[in-house]
Design a protein with these regions (language model features):
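Detector for outer-membrane/organellar transmembrane beta-barrel domains
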Residues: 145-215, 219, 241-244
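Short glycine/proline- and aromatic-enriched beta-strand/turn motifs that initiate or cap beta-hairpins
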Residues: 47-100
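Residue-level signature of outer-membrane beta-barrel architecture
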Residues: 62, 84-86, 115-117, 131, ...
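Outer-membrane beta-barrel "beta-signal"
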Residues: 226, 230-235, 241, 256-270
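Residues that define the transmembrane beta-barrel architecture of outer-membrane proteins
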Residues: 52, 74-78, 105-109, 146-152, ...
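Repeated loop/turn-to-beta-strand initiation elements of outer-membrane beta-barrel proteins
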Residues: 54, 88-94, 121-127, 161-170, ...
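Sequence/structural signature of outer-membrane beta-barrel proteins
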Residues: 61-67, 95-103, 120, 132-140, ...
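Cleavable N-terminal export/targeting peptides
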Residues: 1-53
C-alpha cells in the first residue's frame, strides 16, 4: 500500500448524490470522490421505490492509484463491489481489487458503512468507516507490520445550479494505525467537478497525506489529479492524470519509479 486509500473514481459526478457508479464509485458505489466519502442522498429513493436499494459495479483500470501512489506496481486492476443503501441515508458496501506490493499481498477487500444526507440548503454530508483487508498476507512479508487497517471519514459537498452544475467537495479520513502499523495518518481532499454536454464530466482533485511525526511510513506529501469521463450506455470511460506536487511522494512510488501516471478505465454499475 503505497499511498492512502481512496479508490479509483470517475469524473462525472454530483456531490449531492452518489449516482450509482464507483468506479466510479459512481452509482451507489464507493466513491470517495469529490465529497470524499460516499455521499449518499435520500433523493436516490425519491421515486417511490423500495426503501432499500442494491447495486453492483465492476471496472477495468490500467493502474490502481490510491492517494497518489500505484497499488499495482503500475499494473492493471480489475475492481468491483456491491452496495446497499436505505432511504434513511444509511449504507453498507464491500469492494475488491487486485494489488501488488511485491510480497504475499495480491488482493484488497474493503468493507464500509455510514450515513449521509442533504441539508435544506443543499449541502450534502457523509460520515462513516472503511476497513481495508489484505487476506493471505504473511507477517514475515510485511516487515513486521499488519497491512489491515481502517479509516474513519467525513465529507461535505455542494452542487451549484446552471448548465455545468459545478460541484465542490471536502473530505477527511483518519486512521490511528496506518497500513503496516506505522502510526497515525490523516488524509484531506478538495474536489471540483463540472458536467459538460454529451454526458461528459471533468473532475479535479487535490489530496494531502498528513503523516504523524512518529509515523514510520515516511514524510507527508501532496498530490493532485485531473480527469475526463464519458458515459456511453451502461459504461463509463475515464482518462485521468495523477501527479505529485512535492518530491516527497516519490518515497511511496513503486514500479517504474515515476510519481505521475495516466490511467484509463472502463466501468459499469447496475
Amino acid at each position: 500500500m503505497f499511498g492512502v486509500k481512496e479508490h479509483n473514481t470517475t469524473n462525472n459526478f454530483s456531490c449531492n448524490t452518489i449516482t450509482i457508479e464507483r468506479i466510479e464509485m459512481k452509482k451507489l458505489n464507493l466513491k470517495i470522490l469529490a465529497c470524499t466519502g460516499i455521499l449518499l442522498s435520500s433523493s436516490v429513493f425519491a421515486d417511490g421505490h423500495s426503501p432499500v436499494e442494491f447495486s453492483a459495479n465492476v471496472g477495468y483500470f490500467s493502474d490502481y492509484i490510491y492517494r497518489g501512489g500505484s497499488q499495482t506496481a503500475d499494473g492493471a486492476a480489475i475492481q468491483g463491489g456491491f452496495d446497499m443503501g436505505h432511504e434513511s441515508g444509511f449504507y453498507l458496501g464491500t469492494w475488491a481489487s487486485n494489488v501488488d506490493f511485491g510480497n504475499s499481498a495480491n488482493i484488497e477487500i474493503d468493507f464500509y458503512g455510514g450515513i449521509g444526507g442533504e441539508l435544506p440548503n443543499g449541502i450534502s454530508w457523509d460520515i462513516g468507516a472503511l476497513y481495508y483487508w489484505y487476506p493471505g498476507v504473511k507477517a514475515a512479508d510485511d516487515a513486521g507490520g499488519d497491512f489491515d487497517f481502517y479509516d474513519i471519514y467525513a465529507g461535505v459537498g455542494y452542487t451549484f445550479g446552471g448548465d455545468l452544475a459545478p460541484s465542490i467537495g471536502f473530505g477527511i479520513a483518519y486512521t490511528p494505525d496506518y497500513f503496516g502499523e506505522v502510526g497515525d495518518a490523516t488524509y484531506y481532499t478538495v474536489d471540483f467537478g463540472v458536467s459538460l454536454p454529451g454526458d461528459v464530466g471533468l473532475a479535479f482533485q487535490f489530496g494531502y497525506q498528513d503523516n504523524d511525526e512518529e509515523n514510520r511510513a515516511g514524510p507527508s506529501y501532496s498530490h493532485a489529479s485531473v480527469g475526463i469521463s464519458k458515459a456511453i450506455g451502461i459504461f463509463t470511460l475515464d482518462l485521468s492524470y495523477y501527479f505529485d506536487i512535492d518530491d516527497t511522494k516519490e518515497f511511496w512510488v513503486r514500479g517504474n519509479d515515476e510519481p505521475d501516471a495516466l490511467v484509463f478505465s472502463v466501468s459499469s454499475s447496475f
